[in-house]
Amino acid sequence: MIILGVESSCDETAAAVVEDGSRVLSDVVASQAALHGPYGGVVPELASRKHVEAILPVLGEAMHEAGVTWGQVDAIAATQGPGLVGALLVGLSAAKALAYALKKPMVAVNHLEGHIQAAFLGREELTRPFVCLVVSGGHTALYRVDPDGTTSFLGSTRDDAAGEAFDKVAKLLALGYPGGVEIERLAAGGDPHAFNFPRAFIDGRSLEFSFSGLKTSVATFVRQHGPPSESGEQGAYRLADLLASFQEAVVEVLVNKTVRAAGMCSVGDIAVVGGVAANLRLRERFEEEAGMHRFELHLPARRYCTDNAVMIAAAAYRTWKRSGFCLDPVDLDARSRWF
């Protein structure tokens, strides 16, 4: 079965053609990072306008790269939510139009379920339950996922998502957007134990997250100590040490709570997905914990951590296997909140 997937929930316009939920025939992503960089974050109105410009070229390129005709496509899939509603509408409307015009069945995909599916691309689906950490610029949440696809919410952030905290600290220090990539690069040369930043809800059984206090703590430190230096001369602090310490605080909380959730749910498998799952320090710490606690760790390839349409097409295939497609795409509408 060949599925054309479409993704436009935030600031990437993406399309992909995937066969049988795992064989990637094409994978096209048009990033808007340069557009939003001067603002230090995504501007929703600009994002939706850019999606309008990019959607048809991206769809055409995906079909050309896949080497298939429209007649060979068995179904259309698109992200329905959650995300920026104006951005979602562009990809969803394009997919609905294609499904209607070509008389193809369609499935609407939950963006977070797409991320979860990214951890198992090219692999067999788990036949046992697992705990999944979804961690990105817009989401930081824990779920229990059962073999039949049932997803149970375990806990999420009370304020900022982890990726949002990375972006806000990067903006504070004028590091550019997206901030996570630059912070990771600079933190690699720093001491993660140089500064003891707060870890919210780190003790006890809570599965909730909070990163606003950590972000504020970094801002307060910079305000009190002034700008960093490159080498730390004359008692000044190094930027690399500051960023490494901030990153370590985020990573410790994410790892601690995810492992705790797995223990509370009595499961032996953990998946970590979403844009922040591309962070090498986070992956390293989870791998260390997997070795210590003997759980099976499932990580997407780094290129599939950020938003893409491969995961949407793959998730649609799994949905079809479970319950079939939505045969009337006309009634589908974007959902800014879902789960």
Swiss-Prot record:
Reactions mediated catalytically: L-threonylcarbamoyladenylate + adenosine(37) in tRNA = N(6)-L-threonylcarbamoyladenosine(37) in tRNA + AMP + H(+)
PROSITE patterns found in the cross-reference section: GLYCOPROTEASE
Protein task: Required for the formation of a threonylcarbamoyl group on adenosine at position 37 (t(6)A37) in tRNAs that read codons beginning with adenine. Is involved in the transfer of the threonylcarbamoyl moiety of threonylcarbamoyl-AMP (TC-AMP) to the N6 group of A37, together with TsaE and TsaB. TsaD likely plays a direct catalytic role in this reaction.
Gene3D superfamilies: 3.30.420.40
GO molecular function list: iron ion binding; N(6)-L-threonylcarbamoyladenine synthase activity
Chain positions recorded as substrate binding sites: V134, V135, S136, G137, G138, D167, G180, N279
Family: Belongs to the KAE1 / TsaD family.
GO biological process, one term: tRNA threonylcarbamoyladenosine modification
UniProt cofactor(s): Fe(2+)
Subcellular compartments: Cytoplasm
The species this protein was found in: Syntrophobacter fumaroxidans (strain DSM 10017 / MPOB)
Keyword list, A-Z: Acyltransferase, Cytoplasm, Iron, Metal-binding, Transferase, tRNA processing
The protein, known as: tRNA N6-adenosine threonylcarbamoyltransferase
Entry annotated with the keyword Transport: no
InterPro entries: ATPase_NBD (IPR043129), Gcp-like_dom (IPR000905), KAE1/TsaD (IPR017861), Peptidase_M22_CS (IPR017860), TsaD (IPR022450)
Lineage: Bacteria, Pseudomonadati, Thermodesulfobacteriota, Syntrophobacteria, Syntrophobacterales
Cofactor comment: Binds 1 Fe(2+) ion per subunit.
HAMAP family in the record: TsaD
Binding site for Fe cation: H111, H115, D307
GO CC annotation: cytoplasm
